[in-house]
Amino acid sequence: MFRQKYGNELWLLIGNFKSTIENPKSKISSARILGVDTSLRSTGLGLIQVRGSRLEVVEHGLVKNPAAWPLSRCLGHLHAAIGEILERGEPGTVAIEGIFFCKNVRTAVILGEARGVVIAACAAAGVPVYEYSPRRVKQAVVGFGAAGKEQVVRMVTSLLGLREAPSEDAADALAIAICHAHAGKYDALLGAKEI
């Protein structure tokens, strides 16, 4: 893993992770939330800063694992990437998407393993993890639990004032973080649950 800086963007070779702040460590607060949209090949990450009623993007991007990599290498890479963003971004909490229905048992097991790696990395760093169902995340961001991917991307871009739309996986991660930011006000409605 190494970093390269291009203008105001920080790119990590672990997955084209974009920073929208000149120096992410300069605005550290316990009101930072890391949203994680877990998958084996393309995990979305979205780090936001809560400032009163305003939400600001600190970083967003993807942890990519090539299709040729074996499962163990993918999980190791995901663990290292999560550890790095936890150390660098210093979120106060992490929010992930809950398990959803999978028709393919193998896919469900692999997703569970990837989620386990994320949860373990957070536990090792002492950062609490909360989970939300995909439906709850969409309700919090779009206002409709069965919203499509395009609607989520559009609302995340609008709510966070982004110049460019993030990738679908990064938008999902940012949506999860937004959902958690609102959970303090609407715990019962959004089903906030520490895991």
Question: Which residues are covered by each model-predicted region?
Answer:
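Phosphate- and other anionic-substrate recognition elements at nucleic-acid/protein interfaces
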Residues: 1-195
